[in-house]
């Protein structure tokens, strides 16, 4: 009887360890997903920054392409913020999961601002592009200030 209890106990322990490992892998994948999206978005956003600051010559088609890429990428990271992914190799604060409505509002605002940036880029008007860029950057910074570890 005692042997059966040990075997059953070991089986339960092994299955819970397997479930825990699967959850850890899911969490790791979520973190990798959002980090990759933010990294690529940052690359294109930096190119736009160089243009609006005059460190890179204005090239209308490239600005349009970069702005559209940022717009597309702005929709990708959010599915990587799954419960449990506040642990691990991440700069995300736990507040994201306690203030989900605020986080969702800022993520939606970023998507809106990047969409506007892409539209304004098509005008070719550098002054308007710079303003739209600054509004987008301010939205990024607001979210980082509240929800990103330093």
Language model features with spans:
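Active-site-proximal loop/hinge segments that shape catalytic or ion-binding/gating pockets
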Residues: 13
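Sequence context surrounding c-type heme c attachment/ligation sites in exported
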Residues: 28-60, 64-150
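Bacterial N-terminal signal peptides that target proteins for export
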Residues: 1-8
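Cleavable N-terminal signal peptides
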Residues: 9-10, 20
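N-terminal signal peptide c-region/cleavage motif recognized by signal peptidases
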Residues: 16-17
